Amino acid sequence: GDVYKRQVWFDSGSTFQHVLRGSHKDAYDRAPFHDAGPEADLYLEGHDQHRGWFHSSLLLGCALYDRAPYKGLLTHGFATDGQGRKMSKSLGNVVAPQEITDKMGAEIVRLWVASTDYSGDLNIDDKILARVVDAYRRIRNTLRFLLANVSDFDPAQDAVSDADLLEIDRFALSRAAQMHADILAHFKVYEFHPVVSKLQIYCSEDLGAFYLDVLKDRLYTNAPKSLARRSAQTVLYRITHAMLRLMAPFLSFTAEEAWQAFGSSESIFMETYSDLGTPNEALLAKWTRIREIRDQVNKDIETLRADGKVGASLQASVNLQVGPEDHALLASLGNDLKFVFITSHIILEAGSEILAKVSVSQDTKCERCWHYAPDVGVVPATLALGVLAHRNLGKHFG
């Protein structure tokens, strides 16, 4: 009799017919597009499937329904060693996912995948994994700081309205909203490695190297229920909410672990993304410039530190000359300028360009607040006195 031949990819190419009209039939029947034929949201496989599963699915979909059986198609490369070579036992360069999981945990495997550009091959070796571990620790340590500093914060009773937030806190919220919008835009088009990169930079530079560093005085030395401290906690609480939701797709265990200590619902995976509002562009521009000037001053302070003349920036005294526009910008901070620059003394002067003269403070260090001041030893230093009396300390960002 006649011999019929069937292309070997026919079975897999018809999976949309079996899945969307079989095991997932109830969901398919409720979908508004079901009359036009089954259609998956996404087909995901390696780039070798352009001639295999993707191709046979497209042929069958067009033959049966005059269209592709998927809305989107995502292809990825293959895992190679650190030098981009194909893994083989003869080369001794095989990296087994289970071994990484046993040694470092599943989070590291997930983070490696998410942080790698999957449009090409995905390189992996011990050095690459060490960098992934370092990135994970940076994100986790940031979370630990955030959780610790909102542990006594009840949003129902303690939250400060947006209008009453201190300016630097409003800036931090705008920067978080900007980061949040950028990351969601990447998620929508399945770009995961920029998500990890931007979240890591946000944790290390925006939070660790600036905002959280500046906040420590306010969080640790202001009265517990003061406006200044509650303003900071309000923003930290909202940042934590947003970060956990953004992390959950690729740092699932970590996000869930933190959520169990922080969240109000059963699981982070029952939550939707946060709404941080629209970034304030004027505020972002102002504080971006302040941070640029601060970075330049910090370089001069680091020179003193490298020479062993100061141990911390609070031991430095700064005379700062800046141009007219920058002078107006920094002068608007008043006495808070020294807290932004994390120095015990800073004198602002008009000039034509940025010029910082950094010297060692001749005052005495307060053992409670660590600031250097002339009144240490006479009475408790001003900052420490505010703590002992459980009072607000004047302006200090509020």
What would you call each of these model-derived segments?
Residues 59-64, 306-307, 374:
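Short beta-turn/strand-loop junction motif enriched in small, turn-promoting residues
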Residues 11, 69, 74, 264, ...:
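A generic structural signal for well-ordered coil/turn residues at beta-strand boundaries
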Residues 1-41, 45, 162-179, 311, ...:
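Cys/His-rich finger/ribbon microdomains and the adjacent scaffold used
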Residues 143, 150, 294-297, 304-308, ...:
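Conserved NTP-handling cores and scaffolds of large molecular machines
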Residues 153-185, 212-324, 347-357, 383-384:
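Acidic, turn-prone loop/beta-hairpin segments
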Residues 1-152, 172-215, 234-248, 365-368:
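Structured secondary-structure scaffolds
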Residues 60-64, 261, 392:
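Active-site catalytic microenvironments for nucleophilic, acid-base chemistry
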